[in-house]
Amino acid sequence: MNETTRTYDVIVIGGGPVGENVAERVRAAGLSTVVVERELLGGECSFWACDPSKALLRPVVARADASRVPGLDPAVAGPLDVERVLAHRDRMSSYWKDEDQAEWLNSVSVDLIRGHGRLTGPKQVAVQTPEGDTVVLTARHAVAVSTGTRATLPPIPGLDTARPWTSREATTADKVPGRLAVVGGGVVAVEMATAWQGLGSQVTMLVLDNGLLERMEPFAGELVTDTLREAGVDIRFNTTVTSLDREGGQDGEVRITLSDGGQLAADEILLATGRAPQTRDVGLESVGLTPGDWLAVDDTFQVTGVDGGWLYAVGDVNHRALMTHQGKYQARIAGTVIGARAKGEPIHDAPWGAHVATADHAAVPQVVFTTPEIASVGLTSREAEQSGRRIEVVDYDLARVAGAHQYGEDYRGRARMLIDTDRNTVVGVTFAGPGVGELVHSATIAVAGEVPLDRLWHAVPAFPTLGEVWLRLLETYRG
């Protein structure tokens, strides 16, 4: 076993989209940079989350949309070609190989060390390589932790022998389970229930709460619930799993015992019950932090409670907004900040400035790729009420918009806009309905830009598109 030492201006632990973007930004600022990655460069999003899940979902959602269009419905009524869908998923995931990502990192002059990186003290990182060697790294300016999150599993008796799916297995499975039980009611649960039901699985959802997508506007979860049930998904609310047992070895069925004493059999069970930070084994104790904790940061993504201002936490690991696009937004800011501080340049810390994150508080967009799609940004009505602001809620039936008619018959959808009546700006928007994912950026601009309603009236939507809902919401507000 060999040990080598190297010194860089910046060390990035974690080579997912967030870590890659931090590295690219600080390298563009002229700082020597290295990325340490223990799995695949490109991270969870590229190989086990965003890319493979959307590849599974797209044909399911497209078929559902097409089935409403007169003249198309008989042509799309049959089953999907599962083999081709899974092959496309594999291509979208680059067959779980990261050579292209490594080539890109090299093209921006960032070094890569494969292995498990751990902090060993201020500005110090030790990397255990797959070959058993140790590389000791020292940072002149900063270390950025971008290790993301992992699935959390509840303490259910029989969990070890049941070998449940997490989100990773759900997005990478090579065959359709005949019966799939999904525990959870959040985004992963509803998206994977949508995907695998559409591919031919009999899906049962076991939901602890009394609704789906409980963190969003209630009508969003209600519409998804209706559509899943119409597709044949068995959804059981207020249900707890008390024990699991997989019978007959690896390929045996899973016996699920429920809190009401009932039992359920499934070929696979997906536990979509939350995420935890990947910080258990990155050496936090060496700098006075608690292993396994989320890393608290300020608006420049410096970790609080660590002397010297050299440690940054970017992306899901700081628990501000657990989405890839927000993590990349954070990375652009953090990389710019690190570069500025290394050069002794002033930090512009006013709201919406180049060196602070403001959108993570005010304008976080999200799309849930179910049938129907759900798209949101900013506050929900419940959050707005809790904030103490004076808010007016404006609702509109999306089926009444001319653009919805182009999606065929029986369009079901809803739009909600939240107006801060003191400031005369939009602070939250939620859309539910086919095709609404493409509306979320216009909503994000309205919220992030704090566009006054008097000016928003002059943003004329094209006819006939779903975007015309903006005009209808404004008309409804004015009465």
Regions found by a protein language model. Give the residues of each.
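FAD-site-proximal beta/loop scaffold in flavoenzymes
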Residues: 160-176, 263-345, 349-353
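Rossmann-like dinucleotide-binding cores of NAD(P)H-dependent redox enzymes
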Residues: 91-98, 172, 177-181, 187-248, ...
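Core beta-strand elements of the Rossmann-like FAD/NAD(P) dinucleotide-binding domain
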Residues: 6-8, 132-142, 259-268, 307
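Flexible, glycine-rich terminal cap/loop adjacent to redox cofactors
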Residues: 11-39, 51, 55, 59-62, ...
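Glycine-rich dinucleotide-binding loop and its adjacent helix/turn
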Residues: 50, 147-202, 235, 285-307
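Beta1/beta-strand and adjacent pyrophosphate-binding region of the FAD-binding site
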Residues: 2-16, 176-186
